Amino acid sequence: MPLQPSGLFKTLRDVLPRDAAITMDAGTLCLQATDALNYWQPKSLFTPLDFGLVGFSFACGLGVKLAAPDRPVVSLMGDGGFGMTVSELSTAVDHGINTVTVV
């Protein structure tokens, strides 16, 4: 049974702490998430300017985590966006950058 976006967003709303930072790629899922999730603090939502940049979210999430190591970071993206930046996974491992990635 596939996971429905509304279920994913509800789960994220229930478990994410108020200081969580969320990064997003382009795409329908991420557009829906901008309305469905809570952003409690300034600088909590990181998106490409016009939601037209695929592959932004994962690398952005790594940067956010480096800038704010104590904040939980969740990166939302589709399979295409992750495929475009999967090479950054080795960067995250090599430097111990721990984020949550939802593809």
Can you say where each PLM-predicted feature lies in the sequence?
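Active-site diphosphate/adenylate-binding microenvironment
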Residues: M1-A59, V64
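Conserved thiamine diphosphate
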Residues: A67-V103
